Amino acid sequence: MSHKEPSAAETSTVVHSEEDKAFCIGTGAVISEEREKEVLKNLQNSLTGKTAEENLNDEANHTSSDKSKSEDYQPSNVNVWALRKEKMIPKKHSHVKQEKRFSKSLQLQDPNVWPSPEIAEKQVEDRKLSDDSQKPLAPKANGKEKWVTITPNFTHTPISNRKSSRSRNDGSRRNGNGRRRGNYSSHGSNKRQTNYSREKDASRSIDSSNPSAEYRDDINNTFGSQTVSSANGKEVPQTSEDSSSQAPHHSSSSGHAPSQQGGNKHSYKKSDSQQSFHHKGRNTRKGQRHNNGFYRNIANNIQGPFPNYPVVVNGNGVNPYLCDVQAFLTSQLEYYFSIENLCKDMFLRKHMDDEGYVPLAFLASFNRIKSFSTDLNLLHAACKASDIIDVAIDLQSPMSIKVRRKETWSPWILPSESRLKFEMAKYPQINSSSSMSPLASSISNLTISPPFIPSSVDSIIKRDVQTEVEDKLTV
């Protein structure tokens, strides 16, 4: 490779620049920007081998070319966005759109698409003819399959001009709503009863007083002989057949049987009930009628007045009503001592003593408890039946019984400053005192009745009470 040696001008510039650098380094002076540019150009020229004259010519050519470009530039009228859209749309789709537009324009110009009214009518007629020709023809029917005309003959039953023999009032009279002949007068003139109606009424009364033999036998078999009180007060056994056959028909305007004189208070005469039942149907307008066998059987089956029996109890001798009330009381008292109620019932907590007890009479004064019962012994039994309530028994009087929550009773006790004293007076003084507190007046309605305990359970409860008292006395 041939190495080109630098010229005298290049060596001078290089030497000058090295001298400047040495001067700047030795003195610490600052070179200007123009001087730095010249130094850099000299270095580039020295490396490329160009002279200063060539550099000047290149600069002149560069400036002249820039001027010519600026003079030759003219704005074009081409829409760049339209050209870009054309480039984005493929050529196939553009041809299809153009063809559609062209076909639409041709269709609008075609007279077949928009025909005249005459041509349109002809086209409609031609379509109808073509549809009729395309329909399949019906098959020819043979002689057997032909329709045969049938002329129906209607026969109407003739309407009879004869009036019905039974009148309208007769039907309503059978139902118990119509008027009977001879009982009422219309326009001041009494209607006489015919022989036919009299015989009919007589037969009805006989049927009602004398039931059938089979029915009487059934009554004798089921009920047997009955005691009938006589006028002298003696009881005479008599069967239902005799009493029904020998019963006289007494007329009674009120519809009730005549009162009995002497004899048993609860003795009852079956014939009297039959008479009252019969005459009540005869004399009243809408009473029970005896023309139907159903009512006749009811009259024969009527029983006497019911005696006052005691309250029915179960086999163990326990009244179920008291058991239900005790269950309600137990659930209500358990709610009073529940955590849910103690969180919000401050009135109940204010009446607790140091051990958490509350007088049972205080709970008995609540309206909810009074709606169930006011018996303290029943309340005591309800508390003992609960698993949540603890009972403190005081043998002096049932009014001093106290109850509390069995478990976790200590957190609910309030300080002594916020407590309320429950002054419980003796039971007789509550009713006699005129000036009493509202709480004492609510307790005045309490009753102390002996507990309802069956004989079989009485001994067991007494043993439990004695053992509890002995345990407390020993402690």
Curated annotation (Swiss-Prot):
HTH La-type RNA-binding domain location, by residue? 319-408
Give the matching InterPro entries: La_dom_prot (IPR045180), La_HTH (IPR006630), WH-like_DNA-bd_sf (IPR036388), WH_DNA-bd_sf (IPR036390)
Which Gene Ontology terms of cellular component type are present? cytoplasmic stress granule; cytosol
Q: Does the keyword RNA-binding apply?
A: yes
Domain of life, per lineage: Eukaryota
- Phosphothreonine is found on T408
List, as start-end ranges, the regions of compositional bias called Low complexity.
243-263
Keywords tagged on the record: Cytoplasm, Phosphoprotein, RNA-binding
Residue numbers spanned by region Disordered: 42-292
Q: Basic and acidic residues bias: where? A: 59-72, 119-134
Q: Which residues carry this modification: Phosphoserine?
A: S410
Q: Name one GO biological process term.
A: positive regulation of translation
Q: Where is the composition biased (Polar residues)?
A: 150-159, 220-242
- GO molecular function per UniProt: RNA binding
- Is RNA-binding found in the keyword set? yes
What segments bear the compositional bias annotation Basic residues? 277-289
Q: Where in the cell is it found?
A: Cytoplasm
The cross-references to PANTHER family, in alphabetical order and at most eight, read: LA-RELATED PROTEIN 1, LUPUS LA PROTEIN-RELATED
Q: What is this protein called?
A: Uncharacterized HTH La-type RNA-binding protein C1527.03
